[in-house]
């Protein structure tokens, strides 16, 4: 009987919480009961539990300490690896590049020399882009690195000690920017998707043409009455501002598309496709107005000359485009390299020779048409060419934005001019947002999607940097002070538009996208949901 009194019984019924007892839970309950019978508190640590916890703690700490020791050994290893190896390699490449150029050119690569200025600007622009890329905000897309490149060039120009030693001749600066413009135009032409244009049709045309033309006209009106520019220069400024920046819009759209936002209605696809056509329209309008502005004679003659430049550009681009569709033929060796060399070489030749022959507006249009037709003929094979051209763009992008920033001098800017330029940009952007909202009405989008598209169509960067200085370079070639002042006003507005709209546009896309766009729900891990474009024409 005494043994029966000491016996401990347990009920096999489930607890009232609905949870099932597992064998481990049953064992823990037995141990707790035994400790209570012995007069030991269950919460009081025993000697065994203390030893067990200390051993577990040592096991947890040992791998961490081992990782730190291993990392330290890797950093101090001989030969070095990891971060230290990358730093030494990059510094060696930087010094070697300067040393090779110095051994060939001598004083040109010393402080105050032209090549020295280009190399330092190139290095600083890359560093500026990398530093800005380190600024990462949660749930937001990264700030565009081109903004850091722009600010790097601006600081080089406006810090007296650096500016005295970093000097770049206008001829070199203009030529490098023109080469960068050629690369941008080739990428835009090859990037045009005829299938996307057929699918999106009406709304794509409205979105690419409406806001660009309305903003260009608004900017021309403001530039004429606020900045005192002639009408021709006003429209030059208008088409500089009229383009949206693929460098800001496309990465942000890819992030949203990867998260499933707006895919069902095809919002990212629409914006990426319409962006290329928007840029082409702005560049074509700019080149036409540029040819008219630097023509002599009556207004009718200037308009006809502008039309003639468009015809020459389209005709020449068509001939060259069909030529490089078939030459080189597909059976040749190193086909991709030959195609890349031809399309880049012909585009640079078109941009420079058009200025030489007195038709500056035809070169850019010729390049666009040529690249578009070549891409249509190459079909899927153009992707390999685009990869090589993307590498060329990675080299010239720091030069382009760094040189644009270096053209703006604080000493030469008047406060009232800066204020008027900011007002011009602000009013033009506001009109663009309203116009974009109207253009996507009756296209199958709800109110939130219309608001998002309106703000996503805001950023400016690449095209403004590419063509913003062309008018100034052309004016310098004519040697007229008044025209140079007009060109400087255009460049200042382009600089401010990049500085203001690129970061704001990127942040707005990142903030508004997840809140305003519908997200596609993935029911199964193996199920891929592809966004079908359901846009009413």
Swiss-Prot record:
Changing residue 57 to E: Decreases Na(+) Li(+)/H(+) antiporter activity. Na(+) binds at residues 244, 275, 278-279. It comes from the Eukaryota. One of its GO terms (molecular function) is identical protein binding. The lineage of its organism: Eukaryota, Metazoa, Chordata, Craniata, Vertebrata. The modification Phosphoserine is found at residue 49. Changing residue 246 to S: Does not affect plasma membrane localization. Less sensitive to phloretin inhibition. This is Sodium/hydrogen exchanger 9B2. Electroneutral Na(+) Li(+)/H(+) antiporter that extrudes Na(+) or Li(+) in exchange for external protons across the membrane. Uses the proton gradient/membrane potential to extrude sodium. Contributes to the regulation of intracellular pH and sodium homeostasis. Also able to mediate Na(+)/Li(+) antiporter activity in kidney. May play a physiological role in renal tubular function and blood pressure homeostasis. Plays an important role for insulin secretion and clathrin-mediated endocytosis in beta-cells. Involved in sperm motility and fertility. One of its GO terms (cellular component) is mitochondrial membrane. It is found in: Cell membrane; Mitochondrion membrane; Endosome membrane; Recycling endosome membrane. Pfam families: Na_H_Exchanger. Residues 1-28 are annotated as: Disordered. InterPro entries: Cation/H_exchanger_TM (IPR006153), CPA1_transporter (IPR051843), Na+/solute_symporter_sf (IPR038770). The subcellular localization of SLC9B2 remains controversial. Was initially thought to partially localize to mitochondria. However SLC9B2 does not seem to contain a mitochondrial targeting sequence. It was later established that its localizes predominantly in plasma membrane or intracellularly to endosomes and lysosomes. In another recent study, endogenous SLC9B2 in the distal tubular cell line mpkDCT4 is detected in recycling endosomes but absent in plasma membrane. Belongs to the monovalent cation:proton antiporter 1 (CPA1) transporter (TC 2.A.36) family. Residues 105-113, 162-171, 228-233, 291-300, 358-361, 412-417, 474-486 are extracellular. GO terms for biological process: clathrin-dependent endocytosis; flagellated sperm motility; inorganic cation transmembrane transport; lithium ion transport; monoatomic ion transmembrane transport; positive regulation of osteoclast development; regulation of insulin secretion involved in cellular response to glucose stimulus; sodium ion homeostasis. It catalyses: Li(+)(out) + H(+)(in) = Li(+)(in) + H(+)(out); Li(+)(in) + Na(+)(out) = Li(+)(out) + Na(+)(in); Na(+)(in) + H(+)(out) = Na(+)(out) + H(+)(in). Widely expressed. High levels detected in the distal tubules of the kidney nephron. Detected in red blood cells (at protein level). It is a multi-pass membrane protein. The gene is SLC9B2. Keywords: Antiport, Cell membrane, Cell projection, Cilium, Cytoplasmic vesicle, Endosome, Flagellum, Hydrogen ion transport, Ion transport, Membrane, Mitochondrion, Phosphoprotein, Sodium, Sodium transport, Synapse, Transmembrane, Transmembrane helix, Transport. The chain crosses the membrane at residues 87-104, 114-133, 145-161, 172-189, 201-227, 234-242, 271-290, 301-324, 340-357, 362-373, 391-411, 418-440, 462-473, 487-509.
């Amino acid at each position: 009987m005494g043994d029966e009194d000491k016996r401990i019984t347990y009920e096999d019924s489930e607890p009232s919480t609905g949870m099932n007892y597992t064998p481990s839970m049953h064992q823990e309950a037995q141990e707790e009961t035994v400790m209570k019978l012995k007069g030991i508190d269950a919460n009081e640590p025993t000697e065994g539990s203390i030893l067990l916890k200390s051993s577990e703690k040592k096991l947890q700490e040992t791998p961490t300490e081992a990782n730190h020791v291993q990392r330290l050994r890797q950093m101090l290893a001989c030969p070095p690896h990891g971060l230290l190896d990358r730093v030494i390699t990059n510094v060696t490449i930087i010094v070697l590049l300067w040393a090779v150029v110095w051994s060939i050119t001598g004083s040109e690569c010393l402080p105050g020399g032209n090549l020295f200025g280009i190399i330092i600007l190139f290095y600083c622009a890359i560093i500026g882009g990398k530093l800005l890329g380190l600024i990462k905000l949660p749930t937001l897309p990264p700030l565009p690195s081109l903004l850091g490149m722009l600010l790097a060039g601006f600081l080089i120009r406006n810090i007296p000690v650096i500016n005295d030693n970093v000097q770049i001749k206008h001829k070199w600066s203009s030529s490098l920017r023109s080469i960068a413009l050629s690369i941008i135009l080739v990428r835009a032409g090859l990037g045009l998707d005829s299938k996307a244009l057929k699918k999106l049709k009406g709304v794509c045309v409205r979105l690419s043409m409406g806001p660009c033309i309305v903003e260009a006209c608004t900017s021309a009106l403001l530039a004429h009455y606020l900045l005192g520019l002639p009408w021709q220069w006003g429209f030059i400024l208008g088409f500089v501002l009229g383009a949206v920046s693929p460098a800001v819009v496309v990465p942000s759209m890819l992030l949203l598309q990867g998260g499933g936002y707006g895919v069902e209605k095809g919002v990212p696809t629409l914006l990426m496709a319409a962006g290329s056509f928007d840029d082409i329209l702005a560049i074509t309008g700019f080149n036409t107005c540029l040819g008219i502005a630097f023509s002599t004679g009556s207004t009718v003659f200037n308009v006809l000359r502008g039309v003639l430049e468009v015809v020459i550009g389209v005709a020449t681009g068509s001939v060259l485009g069909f030529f490089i569709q078939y030459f080189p033929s597909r059976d040749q060796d190193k086909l991709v390299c030959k195609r890349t060399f031809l399309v880049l070489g012909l585009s640079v030749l078109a941009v420079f020779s058009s200025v030489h022959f007195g038709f500056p507006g035809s070169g850019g249009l010729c390049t666009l048409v040529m690249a578009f037709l070549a891409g249509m003929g190459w079909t899927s094979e153009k992707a390999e060419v685009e990869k090589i051209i993307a590498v060329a763009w990675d080299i010239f992008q720091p030069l382009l934005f760094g040189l644009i920033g270096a053209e703006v001098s604080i000493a030469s800017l008047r406060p009232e001019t800066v204020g008027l330029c900011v007002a011009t940009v602000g009013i033009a952007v506001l009109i663009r947002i309203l116009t974009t909202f109207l253009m996507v009405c009756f296209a199958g989008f709800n109110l939130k999607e219309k608001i998002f598209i309106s703000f996503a169509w805001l950023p400016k960067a690449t095209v403004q940097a590419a063509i913003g200085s062309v008018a100034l370079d052309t004016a310098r070639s004519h040697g007229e002070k008044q025209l140079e002042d007009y060109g400087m006003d255009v460049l200042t507005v382009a600089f401010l538009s990049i500085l203001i709209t690129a970061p704001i546009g990127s942040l707005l896309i990142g903030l508004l996208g997840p809140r305003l766009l519908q997200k596609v729900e993935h029911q199964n891990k193996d199920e891929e949901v592809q966004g079908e474009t359901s846009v009413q024409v």
